[in-house]
Amino acid sequence: QELNFKVADGKQPFLEAIRGQLQDLTDEKEPISEELLERLLLERRILVIVDRLSEMSEATQAAIRPEMPDFPVNALLVTSRLDEQLGGVTKTTMKPLRIAGNRLSSFMEGYLAQRGKRDLFTDEEFFKACIQLSRMVGDRNITVLLTKLYADQMVAAKEGATDSDLPDNIPELMLYYLNQLNRSVSGQKLSNSTLHEDAITLAWECLKSTFRPAAANRQAAIAALGGDSAESRLKYLEEKLRLIQTKGVGQEQISFSLDPVAEYLAGLHLVEMYDKDQSKWRSFLLKAGAMPGEPAAIKGFLLAVRDCYLAKIPGAKDTDFVPKELKQLGEGSGMAVAAP
C-alpha cells in the first residue's frame, strides 16, 4: 500500500507504516515502541516486504532508500515489474521464469496432471491446444499465468462448464477468465456482459494515470461505474469474484489482483474508445512515450493494447499503423511515425 505522509512531526512514514502493519499482525492494542522496532529491524529480526514497488507513487518510492546510511531496515524484500536500482546497494535479484516454446507442452502436461485432468484429453486434443496457445502469444515467451488461465479454460470447456469454444487470442482469454469467476458464484449474480463492462471500466480507472496497474481511488471508481448500483457492483467484483482488492490505510483505494488482467481489460477500453481513429491513437502514443520510466515500465500495457487492437478491430494486421507503433514503442525504439 502507499505510504501515509500525514504523520506527526519527526516521524518517518516508512517506519510508521511498518509499526501499523506489525500492530495489525500481532493484534496488539498498542503499537510497538519505536526503540524496539528499530532494534528488531537493525538485527534483521523483521523481514520487510515492499510489494509492487514499481506501481507505487513517486513519493512512496522516494521514501524507500536503502542506500542511505540512516535507512532503518536491514532485511528488505522488494517485488517489482522493473529491475529496481535501489540506490546501487548490493542486492540479490530473482526473476520468475517464462516458459520457452519448446517447454510449453511439458509444463502444460505437468499442470493438468497435477490437477488430475490430463486424462480428459487425447494426445491429439492436448497438442492441438498447445499449438493454439503458441499461436496466441506469437514469438513471445509464455508466462505461467497465461498458461494456467488457458489450461483452466481447456478443462472448463471439456467438462461442460462453458458453452463456448476455447479463445483464440489473449484478450478473449481474459474475458473467458471473468466468465469462469462469475460462473462459480452461487445465488444472484451479475450478467457476464455487465461484469465485462464494469471490469473494463475499473481497469482503465487503475491504469489511466500512469499506464501501469496501480491503485485507483475507490470513490472515483464508483463514479466511473455509474448508476445507483455502482457500489454494490464494485463489491461484487471484490467480495464474490476476488478480481479486485481494497488497499490503503483508510481502505480508500482499489486495485486488480492480477496485473496482466488489468492491462488487457484497460487495453479493451482503449480500443472501444479509439477504434480506428488515428488522431486519437497518435495522441495516446505521444502520451505513452512521455511517461516516466517508459518503455520498460509500461511495456506490458502497450503489448496488451496491441493484442486488443489486433483482436477487436476487423481486418487489423501487424503492419497497420497502430499495432506497429505500439510494438515499436514497447520494445523501446520509440515512435516510427511522428505525430502532427
Model-derived regions: residue spans:
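Extended hydrophobic
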Residues: 1-3, 71-74, 85-88, 98-107, ...
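Post-nucleotide-binding-loop coupling segment downstream of the phosphate-binding loop, primarily
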Residues: 1-39, 43
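Short acidic, S/G/P-rich loop/turn micro-motifs used as interaction or catalytic elements
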Residues: 3-8, 53-57, 85
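Short amphipathic alpha-helical segments and helix-helix/interface helices
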Residues: 38, 61-69, 234
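A short acidic-Thr-Gly-centered motif at the start of a beta-strand
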Residues: 38-41, 66, 242-249
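Conserved P-loop NTPase "ATPase switch" module shared by AAA+ and STAND
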Residues: 39-60
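Sensor-1/coupling segment of RecA-like P-loop NTPase cores
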Residues: 55, 68-93
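Extended amphipathic alpha-helical scaffold segments
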Residues: 250, 269-340
